Amino acid sequence: MPDFAEPLARLITEFKRLPGIGQKSAQRLAFHVLRAKREDAEHLSQAILDVKDKLGLCAVCNNIADGEICQYCSDSNRDPSVVCVVEEPHNIVGIETTRQFEGRYHVLHGALSPLRGVGPDMLKIKGLVERIGQGEVREVIVATNPNVEGEATAVYLARLLKPLGVKVTRIGMGIPVGSDLEFADEVTISKAMEGRREM
Amino acid sequence: MPDFAEPLARLITEFKRLPGIGQKSAQRLAFHVLRAKREDAEHLSQAILDVKDKLGLCAVCNNIADGEICQYCSDSNRDPSVVCVVEEPHNIVGIETTRQFEGRYHVLHGALSPLRGVGPDMLKIKGLVERIGQGEVREVIVATNPNVEGEATAVYLARLLKPLGVKVTRIGMGIPVGSDLEFADEVTISKAMEGRREM
């Protein structure tokens, strides 16, 4: 790797710490910033700090919020009787892009993982139990990831929440729309068979 | 697109202004910053400003420099009699990774483009002529891009500099190493034929 002037080398290193950014992308980004107007660089620089300083977690659902309560929990048009449980705040983005779900959310900030020492106490489950205790919630849709940790979390939540009198459902698993059976692994295909629907 | 809290939406917008970063990548980067330690966010934020504030152009070759003279011009191990002319500072990176070139550089900061109104006066050509006037330069290697603008710039430089008594050469064009003839366009193939070498 050639020598860059120190501030440029440092910016490249910082960009490389971001996910999906390798040496070449980091160089391209750094040279872009170098060519950009100082004003634009300032905006980016400030936006990075503001995200850390001005955002907190919603007191109800633990989603990212710029106030005490996030925009989904404070939206009275959304149905409080259906709560979709996700692992991370960015999972909400994917669900919102469907424009299908009109309920509320609950963010666990992780998934159970005995291997990595993540137990139920380290997830934001207590708040979910409290929300259900208030009696408004009718259904909990568990939208944790379809992997070992997400599945374990889903099973744990089902056992914990069903006795409280709520319906606990799991998002459907199967072949992605637009994909090809050829590319699906056997576990996905067997889930798709299990989850078949009458036409 | 779902609604993000304002600081997060702003950071996503700022990331999207960077080259090669679309909506999805910008979201991933922004959520990464959100999860990162404040210290790490500060380092990135500061590095962006430092690149604008602490770097200038080398007084000799117009490369990026954190002092008055860049590291290549101040390196006495490098041969001052061979000068490689490039369009942009980041082009030097590609040449340096070969570890083959031991001469000096000259950065034009652009290429001639009548269509976009870029004439010779807008490129840093004057300094190059002055360097040659000092008598130390023996060969100028024109490593501008192999496209219309870069080629026009190369032809212009050759006409301008040859009368000053220096050898002006152009980097070789042909089939990229590791590629396949099948994927090469006809102009590249004809350049490769022209540039053939006896074995």
UniProtKB/Swiss-Prot annotation, chains A, B:
The keyword Chloroplast does not apply. May play a role in DNA repair. It seems to be involved in an RecBC-independent recombinational process of DNA repair. It may act with RecF and RecO. It holds the Pfam family Toprim_4. PROSITE patterns: TOPRIM (PS50880). GO terms for molecular function: DNA binding; zinc ion binding. A zinc finger (C4-type) spans 58-73. Residues 81-176 form the Toprim domain. Belongs to the RecR family. This is Recombination protein RecR. InterPro entries: DNA_Rcmb_RecR, Rcmb_RecR, Rcmb_RecR_Znf, TOPRIM_dom, TOPRIM_RecR. The gene is recR. Gene3D superfamilies: 3.40.1360.10, 6.10.250.240, RecR Domain 1. One of its GO terms (biological process) is DNA recombination. Keywords: DNA damage, DNA recombination, DNA repair, Metal-binding, Zinc, Zinc-finger. It comes from the Bacteria.
